[in-house]
Amino acid sequence: MGYRKLGRTSSQRKALLRDLATDLIVHERIETTEARAKEIRKVVEKLITSGKKGDLHARRQAAAFIRHEVVEVVQVDAKGKDGSTVKKNRPVYALQKLFDDVAPRYAERQGGYTRILKKGPRRGDGAPMVIIELV
């Protein structure tokens, strides 16, 4: 099965797909061109399917592809040096969100985790724009 070159070298294309796939996992909805969205769809579907497996190998493969990006910062209780309870900020990363939040949501679903909605042409160059989102 072929793929789109997206007018870039292979390393640039891989970086673009990594960035867009990570952004889709973090925000669960992004706006991009139609060609890019169709390529991201392939990547994200495979990432979510491996996230559903949840084993160490799947986690390492996903970690090799997804950017190490902070999704949010949550406060957790932790023990201080004197034994008291203190609040600490702990970051939640994109990989953690994929395995703990996104993948379990689709446990009963056999593929088709994304939806592409056509938006219309971009004003500057007329490129067909779409919104890709997690179902």
Swiss-Prot record:
PROSITE patterns assigned: RIBOSOMAL_L17 (PS01167)
The alphabetical list of record keywords is: Ribonucleoprotein, Ribosomal protein
Which InterPro entries does the record match to this protein? Answer: Ribosomal_bL17 (IPR000456), Ribosomal_bL17_CS (IPR047859), Ribosomal_bL17_sf (IPR036373)
Any one GO biological process: translation
Name the Gene Ontology molecular function terms of this record: structural constituent of ribosome
Question: Organism's domain of life?
Answer: Bacteria
Question: Among the entry's GO cellular component annotations, what is one?
Answer: cytosolic large ribosomal subunit
The UniProt similarity line reads:
Belongs to the bacterial ribosomal protein bL17 family.
**Subunit text:** Part of the 50S ribosomal subunit. Contacts protein L32.
Q: What is this protein called?
A: Large ribosomal subunit protein bL17
Q: Which organism is it from?
A: Listeria innocua serovar 6a (strain ATCC BAA-680 / CLIP 11262)
Q: List the gene name.
A: rplQ
